[in-house]
Amino acid sequence: MNAVTETVDLQAPPPVPLVFTDSAAAKVKDLLAEEGNPELKLRVFVQGGGCSGFQYGFTFDEVVNDDDTVLDKAGVQLLVDPMSFQYLVGAEIDYKEDLEGAQFVIRNPNASTTCGCGSSFSV
């Protein structure tokens, strides 16, 4: 009887990149149309501050840096710098409208705690 040996690669799967929802892309597209500058992209970043240690930020940017992560969705580009990306891997960037108002929302699986307003977190 012959033994069969099989090699199995047990490496962890690569991290899930950011999820940029259709709703968020549509809202950004509307905002960019209002700005009237086709070169603008949405930059999402993480910086120190907020009540939980880190906070999210959004800004429009014309410049794509060499080390940026770029996500394209529905004709909209989302930019994330490398430092921020490490905190956002696997996160979902969404836009919601409900009775509490309308806002961009980041659902981040890396955040161990978040504040009530949802704009700051800790890891």
Swiss-Prot record:
One Pfam assignment: Fe-S_biosyn
Cofactors, names only: iron-sulfur cluster
Keywords associated with the record: Iron, Iron-sulfur, Metal-binding
Keyword Transmembrane helix: no
Keyword 4Fe-4S applies: no
Note describing how the cofactor binds: Binds 1 iron-sulfur cluster per subunit.
Residues the record lists as binding iron-sulfur cluster: C51, C115, C117
One BP annotation, GO: iron-sulfur cluster assembly
A single MF term (Gene Ontology): iron ion binding
InterPro entries: FeS_biogenesis, FeS_cluster_insertion, FeS_cluster_insertion_CS, FeS_cluster_insertion_RrpA, HesB-like_dom_sf
HAMAP family: Fe_S_insert_ErpA
Assembly behavior: Homodimer.
UniProt similarity note: Belongs to the HesB/IscA family.
Function: Required for insertion of 4Fe-4S clusters.
Record-given protein name: Putative iron-sulfur cluster insertion protein ErpA
Species of provenance: Bordetella pertussis (strain Tohama I / ATCC BAA-589 / NCTC 13251)
